[in-house]
């Protein structure tokens, strides 16, 4: 953050607001998937009071002001229902939905970062703001350390479930795949 301040991308006030006093390592825990058969769990990395938690909050706040990455993405089930209500299907058509198993841990971090950078470049924001968002995302993605049972580990691949920026990165990554499918001859419309 000091380097971003020295480059004029952040003010001293902004740096102070992005620094977490007395931060802790993100901690790993599992949430049971009660809706699934067997003993399946969802691995979560708690990002509360960590070195990057305020940066993540800052980024998420900024993302809300930007255009959504892909027209096919939806905010919630209400928006899905609203969109489907506007569609008319023929008797030969069906609606399909896909669920990705372990989406966040399966997203390739560097590819998601490149796609994120491209998405930011398409936004109607200043070059300084764009550069800042991309650099802050790099800081977040480089922080891949976590605590589990008193030992420190580094997650090599995928996004953390529990990190506030993971949803937008996953949306950008999946949207890129959907966009490629939509522009191919794989789908009728």
Name each model-derived stretch.
Residues 2-14, 60-69, 116-129, 164-165:
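Short charge-dense sequence patches
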Residues 14, 21-28, 32, 94, ...:
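Hydrophobic, conserved cores of late-appearing folded domains
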Residues 25-71, 101-105, 154-183:
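Conserved pre-motif C helix in the palm subdomain of viral-like polymerases
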């Amino acid at each position: 953050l000091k380097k971003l301040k020295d480059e004029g991308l952040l003010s001293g006030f902004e740096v102070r607001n992005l620094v977490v006093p007395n931060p802790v390592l993100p901690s790993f825990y599992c949430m049971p998937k009660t809706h699934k058969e067997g003993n399946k769990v969802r691995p979560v990395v708690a990002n509360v009071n960590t070195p990057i938690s305020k940066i993540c909050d800052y980024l998420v706040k900024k993302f809300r002001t930007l255009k959504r990455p892909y027209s096919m993405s939806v905010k919630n089930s209400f928006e899905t229902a609203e969109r489907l209500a506007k569609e008319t299907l023929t008797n030969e058509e069906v609606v399909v939905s896909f669920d990705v198993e372990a989406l966040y841990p399966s997203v390739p971090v560097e590819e998601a970062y490149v796609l994120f950078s491209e998405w930011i470049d398409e936004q109607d924001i200043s070059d300084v703001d764009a550069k800042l968002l991309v650099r802050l995302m790099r800081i977040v993605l480089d922080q891949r350390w976590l605590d589990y049972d008193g030992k420190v580990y580094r997650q090599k691949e995928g996004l953390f479930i529990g990190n506030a920026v993971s949803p937008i990165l996953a949306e950008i990554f999946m949207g890129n795949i959907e966009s490629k499918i939509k522009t191919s001859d794989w789908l009728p419309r």
